Swiss-Prot record:
GO terms for cellular component: cytoplasm; extracellular region; extracellular space; GABA-ergic synapse; Golgi apparatus; postsynapse. Keywords: Glycoprotein, Growth factor, Heparin-binding, Mitogen, Secreted, Signal. Epithelial cell. One of its GO terms (molecular function) is growth factor activity. This is Fibroblast growth factor 7. Residues 1-31 form the signal peptide. GO terms for biological process: actin cytoskeleton organization; branching involved in salivary gland morphogenesis; endothelial cell proliferation; epidermis development; fibroblast growth factor receptor signaling pathway; hair follicle morphogenesis; lung development; mesenchymal cell proliferation. Glycans are attached at N45.
Length: 194
């Protein structure tokens, strides 16, 4: 008797399982419609624009982000209308709004939106601003485990070590020769414009 019941129950369970799988797959394909795998990945991985900006997708090239770069020393990076690079504690200052443009994988150029100057670093590690973008304006962007970013010159090094964009406790740029990735003077948080 048990054998007879099992032979009737087993096919029914198999048919029901197949039916449920077909319904599930059909529902998923209808929901995704004509999306490419890249579009589906974007929808799944990025529930908000802010999450997207903290991912590494933008490092692949061509992306432009408009942000305020807030240093861990409590200063916003600023490039004024004369091209002077320094820190400001005024959040609503238009000279601290930066356009971060990806120029290659992991390499960005930083431009002051209001001043239209690019952030640059010379071979001595001094930060300055330029109207025209060149190799001095390219920085390696790295997202650290503490969720801050660092920006090291893509062209210049000092004794084999990277030279970073940094602001000291008074908002004055630190020469790249005196910076290290671990120092909070070199840690920046790209903040969305509100």
């Amino acid at each position: 008797m048990h054998k007879w019941i099992l032979t009737w129950i087993l096919p029914t369970l198999l048919y029901r399982s197949c039916f449920h799988i077909i319904c599930l797959v059909g529902t998923i394909s209808l929901a995704c419609n004509d999306m490419t795998p890249e579009q589906m990945a974007t929808n799944v991985n990025c529930s908000s624009p802010e999450r997207h900006t903290r991912s590494y997708d933008y490092m692949e090239g061509g992306d432009i982000r408009v942000r305020r770069l807030f240093c861990r020393t409590q200063w916003y990076l600023r490039i004024d209308k004369r091209g002077k690079v320094k820190g400001t504690q005024e959040m609503k200052n238009n000279y601290n709004i930066m356009e971060i443009r990806t120029v290659a994988v992991g390499i960005v150029a930083i431009k002051g939106v209001e001043s239209e100057f690019y952030l640059a670093m010379n071979k001595e590690g001094k930060l300055y601003a330029k109207k025209e973008c060149n190799e001095d304006c390219n920085f390696k962007e790295l997202i650290l485990e503490n969720h801050y970013n660092t920006y090291a010159s893509a062209k210049w090094t000092h004794n084999g070590g990277e030279m970073f964009v940094a602001l000291n406790q008074k908002g004055i740029p630190v020469r790249g020769k005196k910076t290290k990735k671990e120092q909070k003077t070199a840690h920046f948080l790209p903040m969305a414009i509100t």
